[in-house]
Amino acid sequence: MLVTRPLLSPEWVARLKQFKKLIVGFSGGLDSTVLLHVLASTPPLSNQLLAVHINHGISGNSLNWQRHCEQLCLDLGIAFIAKAIEFDRSANVEEAARNARYDFFSSLLEDNDCLVLGHHLDDQAETVLLQLFRGAGVDGLAAMQECSNLGAGQLARPFLTCPRVELEHYARIHELKWIEDESNQDTKYSRNYLRHRVMPLLLEKWPGVAGNISRAATHCQQAKANLEVLAIKDCPDLLNATDHLLIEPIKGLEFERITNVLKFWLKKNRIQLPSSKTFHRIIHEIIFAKLDAMPTVSWNQIQVRRFQQHLYLLKADQINLPKAIKWQQFPASLTYPDADIKLSAVKAQKGLMIPKDAQIEIRFRKGGEEIYWHGQTKHLKKLFQEWQIPPWVRDRVPLVYINDQLACVVGYAVSDLFFTTNPLEAWSIVNNS
């Protein structure tokens, strides 16, 4: 006879009650159906719920599944939205679909919101094994956490210590109906192969193996937390660092501790960790490079560079070089969606003067630019050097041209020819990237 416990403990109810809105990832499968029913049956939480169904468009049954989910939410009196998502299907479909899901969930979360997912103990065990087979370190083997940050809100997995069999028992008792996705039987997908071919053999030999593997993940989570504390102790600059990091404090550390600091820095910037080989390259080719060297290490549209005594992290939208564009709707904001640049114009006490009917264009450095500044004609290249702007950033600094004359280097200088102290005429151009 199956000994059951409440799927949602009083501690979890108290924890979830503090949020303004609980967004439930609702696929219609067993896990999310039980999760939604449990939450809807818990009075302190039932009025906080929003069920979100992601339609991946992979199966021919997708629309039927969406209708099923919508009807169940209608029966339970729960707000429901569905979203069809697009993602790259040319490579790892599982990973691409997952990333697209989480991106959409993240976009929904506001301050004091929580995304609640139905992952259970068996899912955790599978995740640990998949990470192990990939040669993951402590971060990967820590697998899924019960609580973590996501976007502006939080992510919670209240069933992570519950075996799937307990969810099945709950579903039978409450006569719940759920979707069986036919793709879950396809063993060409790694997780399905593990679930249907490997786990049954392990469970036959060691019946409690899923719980033991999950417990190992908890140990790895504690080790991960300890390593993060050590990283901050080794490099206090991590507390303030965003896309740049001071090199000097870490040069005297052992190799493994430098790697630990770099991992913390990349995770803080939401960058997927590279291979051990890449960490070796960052340390040997960049951190210990000659002072005047400017090496680069790249992976997956990410770059780590060095300029003087700092490491710099560049993401894909910071690597793409923007093209010139006319600012026809000035002073409305101007956005470069693929280059992480958004310009806005705000009134100022002194600053840039825009003549009436002027032609305004945003350009970027190509070489040879000059600006009349502080009573002299100066080469932009020399000014960038004086301002100690990293070389790769120089090509991305917006240049405001008015009637084909360089009038403003955004964030740094306004040409004397276009400078005014008249508050009625003065503008400040701000790069909000």
From Swiss-Prot:
EC number(s) recorded for this UniProt protein: 6.3.4.19
GO molecular function terms attached to this record: ATP binding; tRNA(Ile)-lysidine synthase activity
Family matches, as Gene3D superfamilies: 1.20.59.20, HUPs (3.40.50.620)
Disulfide bonds: none
Cross-referenced InterPro entries: Lysidine-tRNA-synth_C, Rossmann-like_a/b/a_fold, TilS/TtcA_N, tRNA_Ile_lys_synt, tRNA_Ile_lys_synt_N, tRNA_Ile_lys_synt_subst-bd
Coiled coil: none
Residues reported in the UniProt entry to bind ATP: S27, G28, G29, L30, D31, S32
Pfam family, one: TilS_C
Catalysed reactions, as listed in the record: cytidine(34) in tRNA(Ile2) + L-lysine + ATP = lysidine(34) in tRNA(Ile2) + AMP + diphosphate + H(+)
Top EC class for this record: ligase
Location within or outside the cell: Cytoplasm
Predominant cellular place of this UniProt entry's protein: cytoplasm
GO CC aspect terms: cytoplasm
BP GO annotations: tRNA modification
Keyword check for Iron: no
Keywords in alphabetical order: ATP-binding, Cytoplasm, Ligase, Nucleotide-binding, tRNA processing
Record family assignment: Belongs to the tRNA(Ile)-lysidine synthase family.
Record text about domains: The N-terminal region contains the highly conserved SGGXDS motif, predicted to be a P-loop motif involved in ATP binding.
Biological role: Ligates lysine onto the cytidine present at position 34 of the AUA codon-specific tRNA(Ile) that contains the anticodon CAU, in an ATP-dependent manner. Cytidine is converted to lysidine, thus changing the amino acid specificity of the tRNA from methionine to isoleucine.
HAMAP family named in the record: tRNA_Ile_lys_synt
Annotated protein name in UniProt: tRNA(Ile)-lysidine synthase
Protein species of origin: Legionella pneumophila subsp. pneumophila (strain Philadelphia 1 / ATCC 33152 / DSM 7513)
